[in-house]
Swiss-Prot record:
<dbReference type="GO" id="GO:0042572">
    <property type="term" value="P:retinol metabolic process"/>
</dbReference>
<dbReference type="GO" id="GO:0030277">
    <property type="term" value="P:maintenance of gastrointestinal epithelium"/>
</dbReference>
<keyword id="KW-0813">Transport</keyword>
<dbReference type="GO" id="GO:0007283">
    <property type="term" value="P:spermatogenesis"/>
</dbReference>
<dbReference type="GO" id="GO:0008584">
    <property type="term" value="P:male gonad development"/>
</dbReference>
<dbReference type="GO" id="GO:0002639">
    <property type="term" value="P:positive regulation of immunoglobulin production"/>
</dbReference>
<dbReference type="GO" id="GO:0034633">
    <property type="term" value="P:retinol transport"/>
</dbReference>
<keyword id="KW-0488">Methylation</keyword>
<dbReference type="GO" id="GO:0071939">
    <property type="term" value="P:vitamin A import into cell"/>
</dbReference>
<dbReference type="GO" id="GO:0070062">
    <property type="term" value="C:extracellular exosome"/>
</dbReference>
<dbReference type="GO" id="GO:0048807">
    <property type="term" value="P:female genitalia morphogenesis"/>
</dbReference>
<keyword id="KW-0844">Vision</keyword>
<dbReference type="GO" id="GO:0032024">
    <property type="term" value="P:positive regulation of insulin secretion"/>
</dbReference>
<dbReference type="InterPro" id="IPR000566">
    <property type="entry name" value="Lipocln_cytosolic_FA-bd_dom"/>
</dbReference>
<dbReference type="GO" id="GO:0032991">
    <property type="term" value="C:protein-containing complex"/>
</dbReference>
<keyword id="KW-0683">Retinol-binding</keyword>
<dbReference type="GO" id="GO:0060157">
    <property type="term" value="P:urinary bladder development"/>
</dbReference>
Length: 201
């Protein structure tokens, strides 16, 4: 009888793993993503950090779509250099379309040379366009198809945060990305609002 319970336990564990496929190729993205509706100002509320030096808090991104339909973005935020020097810095990104309207290749660079630059996948996992958005990027795959170096942002249209119903959806998307409890909250305290030139890069 013990072996029956052992088989049942293994089956339960197996089904649990099946429900949570952490291969990047299995992750869902926003269906019929609309770049025009997504454009405008987004405030980063939470972030799963990658390797390297990126904007750390007070992050505000502005997405736009030109007359040819190409999406681009600028972002401003605080960066700490040498463990004790806080500056506000800008990053710029341009997006190349793929066959999936919610999956882009994003070429990005910092206006200041110390910030990261690269050409990463940029996926819009989910958004309602008016309240929340979840972005995901995997920069390096493991041999088993899971991600070795990823980053992800939770965005809000409101700098004061997300309403409870949106928070619930976001938590579900974080689980689906196998990134639950790996995000840190992003502060918005006005540090980069109207800073003097000596604090801007």
């Amino acid at each position: 009888m013990k072996w029956v319970w052992a088989l049942l336990l293994l089956a339960a564990l197996g089904s649990g793993r099946a429900e949570r496929d952490c291969r990047v190729s299995s992750f869902r993205v926003k269906e019929n993503f609309d770049k025009a509706r997504f454009s405008g100002t987004w405030y980063a509320m939470a972030k799963k950090d990658p390797e390297g030096l990126f904007l750390q808090d007070n992050i505000v991104a502005e997405f736009s779509v030109d007359e040819t339909g190409q999406m681009s973005a600028t972002a401003k935020g605080r960066v700490r250099l040498l463990n004790n020097w806080d500056v506000c810095a800008d990053m710029v990104g341009t997006f190349t379309d793929t066959e999936d309207p919610a999956k882009f290749k994003m070429k990005y660079w910092g206006v200041a040379s110390f910030l990261q630059k690269g050409n990463d996948d940029h996926w819009i996992v989910d958004t309602d366009y008016d309240t929340y958005a979840v972005q995901y990027s995997c920069r390096l795959l493991n041999l088993d198809g899971t991600c070795a170096d990823s980053y992800s942002f939770v965005f809000s249209r409101d700098p004061n945060g997300l309403p409870p119903e949106a928070q619930k959806i976001v938590r579900q998307r974080q689980e689906e990305l196998c990134l639950a409890r790996q995000y840190r909250l992003i502060v918005h305290n006005g540090y980069c609002d109207g800073r003097s030139e000596r604090n801007l890069l």
